[in-house]
Swiss-Prot record:
UniProt family annotation: Belongs to the quinolinate synthase family. Type 2 subfamily.
Species for this entry: Agrobacterium fabrum (strain C58 / ATCC 33970) (Agrobacterium tumefaciens (strain C58))
Membrane-spanning ranges: none
Primary location recorded for the protein, binned into one broad class: cytoplasm
Cellular component aspect of the GO annotation: cytosol
Main function: Catalyzes the condensation of iminoaspartate with dihydroxyacetone phosphate to form quinolinate.
E.C. designation(s): 2.5.1.72
Name listed for the protein in its UniProt record: Quinolinate synthase
Pfam family, one: NadA
Positions bound to [4Fe-4S] cluster: 132, 217, 303
HAMAP family according to UniProt: NadA_type2 (MF_00568)
Superkingdom of this protein's organism: Bacteria
Length: 345
């Protein structure tokens, strides 16, 4: 049975979004609330206000910026983030950051990627335990064995991996550019790691033979085709959008599939009367604020790793320089090349 959630708040999301006010402009949490009043109840905001004020001041003092993934909660996304987006957007924007300090409000592989692209900057992650089931599913040793089993076949690695795994790969991809990356190699066969479902879903869109691994996202693997049938019965006319990390039978049963950025674009372009986004809970909240005329049906699969990031530990990270992210110099160069090669496409 699909668990449903009624959510009374939403947040902004785009492929990238930057507050007009950044680290150099004086803002107070009180004045900021005018921007978020429609998405965060006043009583709840009052509990966040001290941390928001402190973080805004710390950003000014330290010349810091906060990059936040689309799955972050509203008080982070609205209250303190400078740049928000999906994995691809954050990787691209990380290359343009001019601040001295980057705080990555997301999971560990994202912070590592930011460090790879900004080796001279201080990169902090508020909670070092904010991991990823996909990143944990594969090691450099696994890739070495795969290269022996498939000699000469290039390795495309999802960005949801450790720096060590990226270093053992030829090029990275995200859910938003996977097909383009695979086809850019100009070869008939590719090892596409580690997300089995992403590889199988991309394989339906390309003539390139994709050899998959057995990793899965613990959020997206929970969705089923039965969930979609239940949603259609309970909510006639609903348009179903599925993330490509969902099982292939889920993607097949959906009306449309794409990354979080692509889903957001779809809603803005098509303006469905009723829609469900099969991805992490916060994504529906994020998109809904732009489209008050669209009814969002919210299945609830939370990412426990993303939700480890809080205003409190963002504040502590900035106050104490806690959880600075480092990448072993022995692998940093190769990992950076794999990411940069992706960004050139």
């Amino acid at each position: 049975m699909l668990t449903m959630r009624i959510c009374l708040r939403a947040t902004y999301t785009q492929k990238e979004y930057k507050w007009e006010s950044t680290v150099n402009e004086q803002i107070s949490a009180a004045s900021l609330y005018d921007r978020v009043a429609r998405v965060i109840p006043k009583a709840e905001w009052m509990g966040f206000q001290d941390d928001v004020e402190a973080i805004l001041e710390l950003k000014r003092k330290r010349n810091a910026v906060i990059l936040a993934h689309n799955y972050q909660t509203p008080e982070i996304f609205h209250g303190v983030a400078d740049i928000v987006g999906d994995s691809l957007a954050l990787a691209r924007k990380a290359m343009e950051v001019e601040a001295d300090v980057i705080v990555l409000a997301g999971v560990h592989f994202m912070a590592e990627t930011a460090k790879l692209l900004n080796p001279e900057k201080t990169v902090l992650i508020p909670d070092m335990a904010a991991g990823c089931s996909l990143a944990d599913s594969i090691t450099p040793e696994d890739i070495a064995l795969l290269r022996k089993a498939y000699p000469g076949v290039p390795v495309v690695t999802y960005v949801n991996t450790s720096a060590a795994v990226k270093a053992a790969s030829d090029i990275c991809c995200t859910s938003g550019n996977a097909r383009q990356v695979v086809e850019s190699l100009g070869v008939p066969r590719v090892l596409m790691l580690p997300d089995e479902y992403l590889a199988k879903n991309v394989a339906k869109e390309t003539s390139v033979e994709l050899i998959a691994w057995r990793g899965h996202c613990e959020v997206h693997e929970l969705f089923t085709a039965d969930d979609i049938r239940e949603l259609r019965e309970s909510h006639p006319g609903v348009i179903v959008l599925a993330h490509p990390e969902c099982p292939p039978e889920v993607v097949d049963a959906a009306d449309f599939s794409g990354s979080t950025a692509v889903m957001s674009d779809y809603v803005g372009r098509e303006r469905p009367a009723r829609v469900v986004l099969l991805t992490e809970c916060s994504m529906s909240d994020n998109v809904a604020v732009h489209h008050p005329d669209v009814e969002f049906i919210r299945p609830c699969n939370l990412c426990p790793h993303m939700k480890r990031i809080t205003l409190g530990n963002i504040r502590t990270a900035l106050e104490e320089n806690r959880h600075e992210v480092t990448v072993d110099p022995a692998i940093a160069g190769a990992a950076r090349r794999a990411v940069e090669r992706m960004l050139q496409i």
